[in-house]
From Swiss-Prot:
<keyword id="KW-0496">Mitochondrion</keyword>
<protein>
    <recommendedName>
        <fullName>Isocitrate dehydrogenase [NAD] subunit beta, mitochondrial</fullName>
    </recommendedName>
</protein>
<dbReference type="InterPro" id="IPR004434">
    <property type="entry name" value="Isocitrate_DH_NAD"/>
</dbReference>
<keyword id="KW-0809">Transit peptide</keyword>
<comment type="function">
    <text>Plays a structural role to facilitate the assembly and ensure the full activity of the enzyme catalyzing the decarboxylation of isocitrate (ICT) into alpha-ketoglutarate. The heterodimer composed of the alpha (IDH3A) and beta (IDH3B) subunits and the heterodimer composed of the alpha (IDH3A) and gamma (IDH3G) subunits, have considerable basal activity but the full activity of the heterotetramer (containing two subunits of IDH3A, one of IDH3B and one of IDH3G) requires the assembly and cooperative function of both heterodimers.</text>
</comment>
<dbReference type="GO" id="GO:0005739">
    <property type="term" value="C:mitochondrion"/>
</dbReference>
<dbReference type="GO" id="GO:0000287">
    <property type="term" value="F:magnesium ion binding"/>
</dbReference>
<dbReference type="GO" id="GO:0045242">
    <property type="term" value="C:isocitrate dehydrogenase complex (NAD+)"/>
</dbReference>
<keyword id="KW-0816">Tricarboxylic acid cycle</keyword>
<keyword id="KW-0007">Acetylation</keyword>
<dbReference type="Pfam" id="PF00180">
    <property type="entry name" value="Iso_dh"/>
</dbReference>
<feature type="transit peptide" description="Mitochondrion">
    <location>
        <begin position="1"/>
        <end position="33"/>
    </location>
</feature>
<dbReference type="GO" id="GO:0006102">
    <property type="term" value="P:isocitrate metabolic process"/>
</dbReference>
<dbReference type="GO" id="GO:0006099">
    <property type="term" value="P:tricarboxylic acid cycle"/>
</dbReference>
<feature type="modified residue" description="N6-acetyllysine">
    <location>
        <position position="199"/>
    </location>
</feature>
<comment type="similarity">
    <text>Belongs to the isocitrate and isopropylmalate dehydrogenases family.</text>
</comment>
<dbReference type="GO" id="GO:0051287">
    <property type="term" value="F:NAD binding"/>
</dbReference>
Amino acid sequence: MAALSRVRWLTRALVAAPNPGAWRSLCTSTVAQASSRTQGEDVRVEGAFPVTMLPGDGVGPELMHAVKEVFKAASVPVEFQEHHLSEVQNMASEEKLEQVLSSMKENKVAIIGKIHTPMEYKGELASYDMRLRRKLDLFANVVHVKSLPGYKTRHNNLDLVIIREQTEGEYSSLEHESARGVIECLKIVTRTKSQRIAKFAFDYATKKGRGKVTAVHKANIMKLGDGLFLQCCEEVAELYPKIKFEKMIIDNCCMQLVQNPYQFDVLVMPNLYGNIIDNLAAGLVGGAGVVPGESYSAEYAVFETGARHPFAQAVGRNIANPTAMLLSASNMLRHLNLEHHSNMIAEAVKKVIKVGKVRTRDMGGYSTTTDFIKSVIGHLHPYGG
């Protein structure tokens, strides 16, 4: 347990360091150096890393089952602490929300499914999913949209990253009826949070060796709100002369993503635009079932699918594609500095897709979720072996 305590101490030290928000998601290499290990070798501990698991709604529980089965087969040293929070299954309450928050604050790392938000207004404008992200200050959502070898789509060899500010903007939950039949919805944009997400995007590009950041906005219409966001991006860009900076209006960005997505590298944008672009870009490489995502605060990391879709119509039919969730789980292991297990699982998933014999319906095949899980387990082997 001493080794585990040492790694946790190092992680907390990194979190407490100056400007932690920009580097929390990128700290695994620092931990690796501090623990004096060879690259690709896991921390050998007597216990397991505690991780909060939130299955969510729709096919979320089925996808989490896939994660648990693959982790078990790969002997991953992770212990899941499972909680349930659902507005559609009447499993949501202030008490349950506090239990989830307590677990996530203790463990610092979580893997979650989509918590579906009902459209009906029941007296509370902020959904439990939104409240969870706000309370943990999960300001940066990162979605890596990358083509999977062996799976042909309209655009191949695509590799771009979408970074979304997800604690303000249109998701402020500030709505009211100013007069009968007239609803006002407030969009909140602050200099502090706009600068923070811009710096996160440029730090990410620097760390990952990417050459360009594109700020997506609608400042031609929302001159003050999006104007402030764009101004902050421009100011931060000046601090990174080696990174090319471009700006693009959101509607043009949507068209350009469909026509020529290869022009993009890292895109940074406010909340609502990010939600839309995440899903649009996922469709370029195969859909919601194949794109992983993650969200970061200065202290916490949450791993999830890139396109948050509950896929309710597939519940119980054993047809959901676990690719996105398994790749997200692999990213979580890398965040925990479990490089060996992370690579082993990611390579197994990619091998199954490349071979092409086992594919779920969304990928044009007839295989079940169970078939896919078994095939991934069958392709597990020590990375590099």
